[in-house]
Design a protein with these regions (language model features):
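Hydrophobic transmembrane alpha-helical segments in integral membrane proteins
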Residues: 1-12
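Alpha-helical transmembrane segments
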Residues: 14-26, 422
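Alpha-helical transmembrane segments of multi-pass membrane proteins
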Residues: 21-23, 66-79
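A juxtamembrane structural motif centered on a specific transmembrane helix
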Residues: 25, 34-50, 415-432
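Hydrophobic transmembrane helix bundles of membrane-integrated enzymes that assemble
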Residues: 52-72, 91-300, 349, 354-425
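Short, hydrophobic transmembrane alpha-helix segments
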Residues: 73-88, 107-108
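Flexible juxtamembrane loops connecting transmembrane helices in multi-pass membrane enzymes
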Residues: 88-91, 255, 289-327, 341-342
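TM-adjacent membrane-interface loops and short helices in multi-pass inner/ER membrane proteins
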Residues: 313-347, 354, 358-364
C-alpha cells in the first residue's frame, strides 16, 4: 500500500493547487481565494458533474467497505493455507479495488473546506509517515476509510460492511466445520483448548465477531430494541464459551449493559456531564494502561514472576498484559514516528501498542480524536453510537485489534472529529 499512500497524498496536493488557481481566477486575489477556500466547502478539482459525483459518494464508500471486509474476513482465514490463489490473486484484487473506491470517494465525491481538509490532510500525512515506519497495513487502511467516511450515509455503508462480513464468515465457518479449512486448529492456554473457527487464532475470530456485533448495533441505533441487547449478550456468551475470547466477550457484555441502560433510562445519557465524562474515559483508560505496569516488580526468572501479589493477580487475570507492557518499557525504544515491532514482548493493550508501533505523536492524536468523537456523539444525542465507541474502548484495553477496521467499524465515527464537523452532521450524507 506504499504506492497508494503516496498517490493519494500527491493527488490531495494537486487538488489544493488546482482549487487555489480556480479560486484565484474567480475572486481576483490570492487573499480572497484563501478566504473562500478556507470557509466554503467545495468539491476538489472543480464542480464539473457535481450532482452525479455526489450521488456516487455513499455507493463508492459502501463498495470499498464491503470489498475490504470480504478481503480481511475470507482471505486472512486459514483458507489461505489451502489455496495459494487466496493470498496470491484474490486478496490483492479485493484490496486494491477497495482502496481505489476509497480514493475515488475522497478525491471526486466529497466537498471540503480548507479548514477541514487541512486538519485531515495533516493527519493523513502523519499517518502515512507512521505507516512507512511501522509497515502496519491495517493502520493505513483504517485511516483511509475514516477520511473516506465524510458526508456519507453511514448506515447504508455499514449494511454493506455487515453483509460482506457475515457472508464471508459463514463461508469460512462452513469450510471449517466441513473439515476443509483447518478443522483441528486449536490454541492451548493454561491447560485449555480454544477453537479457532478457521482463523488460526481464537482472538482473531473474536475480534471479527466483535466488529460484526458493533456494526449490527450501530445499524440498530435509531430503532434499538431489547432484542438487540439480547443479541449482544448472546454474542458475549458465545465468545466466552466458544473461542474463549475473554476481552471480546467482556466488551460484548459491557455493550449489553450500556444498551440496557439506554433502553431503561435513556435520560441517563442526556445529562450535561455525560459527554465530558465519556471523553475523560479515554484519558482514564490510557493512564491505567501506561501507569499500572510501572507498579510491577520482577521477583524471579520466569516471565510471570512479578509482584506485588495483588498486582500480579491482576496481571494474571489479564493474561500478562501488564507484564508485557512492563517488559516493553525495558526492551523497546520509543520512536517519534513509530517502528516495526518484534514478536516479543507481545503488546495487546492498544494504548501501549500504539505508543511503540505508531509513536507518541500519533498515539496522542488517536486518543484526542477518540475523546472528541465520544464527546460529540453524546453531545448530539447519538447515544447508541457513543455506547459502541465505549465498548471498543474496553476492548482496546486488552487487545490491539482495535486498529483493524474489521474489528473496529466504530473508527468511522471519528471522521467528524477529524474534519472538525458539527456533531449533528456526523454519519449523515452531505446536503445537496
Amino acid at each position: 500500500m506504499f504506492e497508494f499512500a503516496n498517490g493519494l497524498l500527491l493527488a490531495l496536493f494537486a487538488a489544493a493547487v488546482f482549487d487555489l488557481a480556480a479560486a484565484w481566477r474567480r475572486t481576483g486575489s490570492v487573499q480572497a481565494a484563501f478566504g473562500w477556500l478556507w470557509h466554503k466547502e467545495h468539491p476538489l478539482f472543480g464542480d464539473w458533474l457535481w450532482p452525479r459525483r455526489q450521488a456516487l459518494a455513499t455507493p463508492l464508500f459502501a463498495a470499498g467497505l464491503a470489498l475490504y471486509e470480504a478481503n480481511v474476513v475470507f482471505c486472512n482465514s486459514m483458507a489461505r493455507e489451502n489455496w495459494a490463489w487466496v493470498q496470491g490473486t484474490l486478496s490483492p484484487l479485493l484490496e486494491w479495488t477497495a482502496f481505489l473506491c476509497f480514493g475515488a470517494k475522497i478525491l471526486l465525491c466529497t466537498r471540503y473546506s480548507w479548514r477541514g481538509l487541512g486538519l485531515a490532510g495533516a493527519l493523513y500525512f502523519i499517518a502515512r509517515w507512521v505507516h512507512f515506519n511501522s509497515h502496519n497495513i491495517w493502520f493505513i487502511g483504517i485511516v483511509v476509510a475514516i477520511l473516506a467516511a465524510k458526508d456519507v450515509d453511514l448506515c447504508r455503508a455499514l449494511r454493506a460492511f455487515f453483509a460482506a462480513g457475515a457472508a464471508a464468515t459463514a463461508v469460512v465457518l462452513a469450510l471449517h466445520f466441513a473439515g476443509i479449512v483447518a478443522p483441528d486448529m486449536v490454541s492451548e492456554r493454561v491447560g485449555e483448548y480454544r477453537s479457532t473457527f478457521g482463523y488460526g487464532h481464537p482472538n482473531t475470530f473474536g475480534g471479527l465477531v466483535v466488529g460484526l456485533l458493533l456494526a449490527w448495533v450501530m445499524l440498530r441505533a435509531r430503532h434499538l430494541r431489547w432484542a438487540d441487547a439480547a443479541v449482544s449478550a448472546a454474542v458475549g456468551v458465545f465468545l466466552w464459551e466458544g473461542p474463549a475470547c475473554r476481552t471480546a466477550a467482556l466488551s460484548a457484555f459491557f455493550l449489553t449493559l450500556l444498551l440496557a441502560a439506554a433502553l431503561v433510562r435513556p435520560s441517563v445519557f442526556r445529562g450535561r456531564p455525560v459527554p465530558w465524562l465519556a471523553a475523560l474515559s479515554v484519558a482514564v483508560v490510557g493512564a491505567v494502561s501506561y501507569l499500572l505496569p510501572l507498579g510491577l516488580v520482577k521477583c524471579g526468572p520466569w516471565n510471570n514472576d512479578f509482584g506485588p501479589p495483588w498486582l500480579a493477580r491482576i496481571d494474571g487475570a489479564l493474561t500478562n498484559r501488564l507484564s508485557m507492557t512492563w517488559m516493553a518499557y525495558r526492551v523497546h525504544d520509543i520512536k517519534i514516528a513509530g517502528q516495526v515491532l518484534s514478536d516479543w514482548p507481545a503488546l495487546d493493550n492498544s494504548f501501549a501498542f500504539m505508543l511503540y508501533q505508531f509513536g507518541p505523536v500519533m498515539a496522542a492524536i488517536i486518543a484526542a480524536l477518540f475523546a472528541a468523537a465520544l464527546w460529540g456523539l453524546f453531545r448530539s444525542g447519538k447515544t447508541v453510537w457513543g455506547c459502541c465507541l465505549l465498548a471498543m474502548l474496553v476492548y482496546s484495553f486488552a487487545e490491539c485489534q482495535s486498529f483493524h477496521l474489521t474489528t473496529n467499524p466504530t473508527a468511522l465515527l471519528l471522521c467528524g472529529a477529524v474534519f472538525a464537523m458539527p456533531p449533528n452532521r456526523w454519519g449523515e450524507a452531505s446536503p445537496s
